[in-house]
């Protein structure tokens, strides 16, 4: 980014973002940076407690991951974003299907501020997930509503809906059963027409999520095939720009917040995502580092040597929540401070002032362009007109609200 000869001052306490569209009855004021989805079971009890306690100290939110809400989330007392994945853990029937009654019971908790439907994640889009039986304790099994002694699988896709229109109906169902709390979904961008089909469903039904979390292919996990981690899913910048364009093109952007996640590790990383179209960011990797993660690559073995990604009590005791919660709090505070200083140095007075042209990229040894020149940015409603931009025309024509399949088979 380029600095200004007339720098501005930003107050760190002003870095809040309101989430909740026209149909939301309980809007939430979120921090600019929050903890991205990581499940209890994948993470240790002490890790979850430290993360949530740090979130409480710093007044930011903690995404539960798809593993459900544990007593360690409650002990921390921090705001929760309850993530619901394809396994419907903590809100499932015995056959693994979604239970609206169990969902309503959990969603009514005051600590739950928002609900996020997980469609896919950047580390392994289209693959599903697994909690090895070695990491499954009786407590985790009770929280998730699964039997002991076997791997816990999250299917690649959802059973509660199978089309874009049904996804919107599911969003509406969760909104009603939660008492009007913000409802959104998370995805890593894959086939463009599929997200455009969701946009068509929003436009046709008038049902819109309150937020969409865009995860980049850079996102990580300790339990994903390397081929998926390295090769599948749109990178965050391209995915973020596309989602912003699609929502803008269908004139939906004004009612929907975009959350960016995927290797957000620095103040500049946050500024970059905001300039490209995000309203706020989530981070998992940086938060794990604050907990003491040394990237030992043992996440899926239950032998994490620093007690972050294990249910082994002997190893878990090496992580002291009373110490690590302060580190989580300090990380968040210092990253937001860095954001304020960078934006102030640019001469801007608010994060909302960031635009793609503020972000510069070297193209060659002799050429620099800003992101407004490198990428196309659509005008509001441009995908609803007869003269659809050429770069989007084929994908829009192939998208249908009644199916994720292409119109052109």
Regions found by a protein language model. Give the residues of each.
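Short flexible/disordered coil segments
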Residues: 125-149, 183, 242-252, 275-281, ...
């Amino acid at each position: 980014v380029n600095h200004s000869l007339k720098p501005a001052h930003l107050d760190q306490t002003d870095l809040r973002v309101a989430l909740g569209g026209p149909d939301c009855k309980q809007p939430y004021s979120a921090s600019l940076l929050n903890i991205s989805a990581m499940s209890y079971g994948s993470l240790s009890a002490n890790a979850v407690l430290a993360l949530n306690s740090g979130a409480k100290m710093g007044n930011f939110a903690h995404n539960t991951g798809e593993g459900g809400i544990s007593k360690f989330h409650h002990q921390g007392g921090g705001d929760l974003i309850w993530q619901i994945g394809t396994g419907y853990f903590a809100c499932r029937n015995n056959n693994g299907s979604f239970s609206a009654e169990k969902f309503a019971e959990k969603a009514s908790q005051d600590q739950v501020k928002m609900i996020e439907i997980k469609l896919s994640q950047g580390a392994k889009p289209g693959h599903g997930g697994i909690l090895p039986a070695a990491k499954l304790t009786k407590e985790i099994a009770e929280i998730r509503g699964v039997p002991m002694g076997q791997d816990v699988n999250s299917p690649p896709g959802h059973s509660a809906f199978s089309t874009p229109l049904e996804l919107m109906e599911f969003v509406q169902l969760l909104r009603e059963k939660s008492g009007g709390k913000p409802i959104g979904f998370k995805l890593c961008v894959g086939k463009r027409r599929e997200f455009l089909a969701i946009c068509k469903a929003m436009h046709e039904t008038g049902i819109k999520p309150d937020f969409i979390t865009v995860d980049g292919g850079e996102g990580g996990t300790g339990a994903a095939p390397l081929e998926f981690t390295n090769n599948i899913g749109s990178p965050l910048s391209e995915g973020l720009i596309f989602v912003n364009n699609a929502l803008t093109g269908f004139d939906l952007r004004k009612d929907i917040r975009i959350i960016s996640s995927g290797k957000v590790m620095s103040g500049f990383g946050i500024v970059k995502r905001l300039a490209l179209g995000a309203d706020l960011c989530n981070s998992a990797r940086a938060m794990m580092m604050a907990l003491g993660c040394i990237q030992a690559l043992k996440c899926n073995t239950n032998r994490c040597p620093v007690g972050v990604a294990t249910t082994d009590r002997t190893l878990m005791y090496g992580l002291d929540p009373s110490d690590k919660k302060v580190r989580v709090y300090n990380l968040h505070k210092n990253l937001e401070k860095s954001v304020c200083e960078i934006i102030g140095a640019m001469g801007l007075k608010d994060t909302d002032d960031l635009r793609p042209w503020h972000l510069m990229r070297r193209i060659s040894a002799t050429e620099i362009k800003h992101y407004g020149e490198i990428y196309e940015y659509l005008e509001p409603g441009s995908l609803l007109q007869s003269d659809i931009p050429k770069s989007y025309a084929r994908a829009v024509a192939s998208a249908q609200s009644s199916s994720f399949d292409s119109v052109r088979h």
